[in-house]
Amino acid sequence: MVTGRLRNTKHFVTDPITFLSDSMAQHGNVFRFQLVNGSMVGVTHAHHIKYILQERMANFTRETQLYDILELFAGRGLATIADHNRWRRNRRLVQPAFHHKKISALSEIMVTEIDSMCDEWAEHARAGRTINIGEQMSHLTLRIVVRALFGLDPHGPEVTGFARAAQSVNAELGKFVRMPLIPLKFPTPSHRRFWRAVGEMDAIVYTVINELRDSDSDGLLSMLMNATEADTNSKLTDRELRDEVITMLFAGHETSSSALTSAMLLLQVHPEARQRLCDDVDDVLSDGRATMTDLPALPYSKQVLEEALRLKPPIWMGQRRADQDDEIGGYHIPAGTPVMFSYYHAHRNPECWDQPDTFDPDRFTPDAVAARDRNVYLPFGAGGHLCIGNTFAMMEMQLALSTIVRRFELTIQNPDLTPTSALTLNTKYPVIATLTERR
């Protein structure tokens, strides 16, 4: 038993995706696995994930080790709050900032920042310089979120500092999430890097909150500061604002940058899809830039992104704990059992998808979507905890991908689709590309 726990733990820590793939192949869609710090149930079917997140949401709580860890840096934002009543109260306060009309009004911010990045890329192309696509997408999506959220200049040192700190948190916390044997309060080199990064993020966010109190900014953060709950006349405290801002900044740029990087990498290794997308954007974008009004005429760019989100979901897994005895797919779940579910494996489950490992954007034509069980695709979660920023993210990504493909031909050096999993799913190796301007 001890040997098995050690073997499982080593495999899980070094490569959790392959570990879960092997477990799924051997045991099916629901299985228990033993690690040195305890046992856990794994779930790899979308219907079972929907059951956990929607049908039995009240029984499967966020009171898990994963959310305890996430709370250390993200606090109690919408993505991490365990108490359901508090989550509902904060969701009501935050929701108006993400109304469709508000998001649509932010499209010009997205277009401006995308154009600015592409102008920088044009200089790189003329000079023959390479770019790191992952880093470029991270900077772009953070700049967009900073302007939309804060209404501030996204090119200042605060943005660079936050991006650096967020990358450090993602890397160091990803290690700890997989195997939290040494408490974070112990000053190992990794833990010191984590706490230093959290301190940097806090300093930046609190400074901006204080500055915005005396400004006339109309960004989302100003809306959150002024949001009042009708029943209690209460507002978000500074700590609650900090937690929501950290959550939005981290989730709002890490996830979108991961998806955009994956989409461009997948297009590189599937030239027929890349050419089809080029043909689409060439027909629609005569001036080389996509705006919100162009998006309905660019369905294939959305299909490419949706398929990238299926194969490479940035938020690739989640955890819950059974408050009372339950049953998932005929498998008994005793009260107190931690459950880990994988969107990555659910999106590649052969019971739900034909040729699940094949990149095929035509899975997301209107006819294909209408013919498919809508419960098998969960790129933004499910149930009441569905990602509040999903409309923002899809608009941002479609604008960016369409404009990039219209303006540039990217040649990625040694494209490798191997994933690596920290808090978010990323490519294992840097995605380095040369640029050629398209006319």
Residue ranges and their predicted role:
Residues 8-28, 203, 207, 288-329:
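Conserved cytochrome P450 K-helix E-x-x-R motif and the immediately C-terminal K′/meander segment
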Residues 24-25, 114-118, 164-168, 282-290, ...:
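Cytochrome P450 proximal C-terminal region
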Residues 1, 61-67, 71, 86-87, ...:
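Cytochrome P450 heme-thiolate monooxygenase catalytic core
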Residues 1-76, 81-89, 104, 108-116, ...:
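N-terminal membrane-proximal hinge/A-helix region immediately C-terminal to the signal-anchor transmembrane segment
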Residues 255-280, 390-407:
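Cytochrome P450 catalytic-core helices
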Residues 341-369:
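Conserved cytochrome P450 K-helix/beta-meander segment immediately N-terminal to the heme-binding cysteine loop
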Residues 1-2, 107-111, 162-168, 217-223, ...:
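Cytochrome P450 I-helix active-site segment
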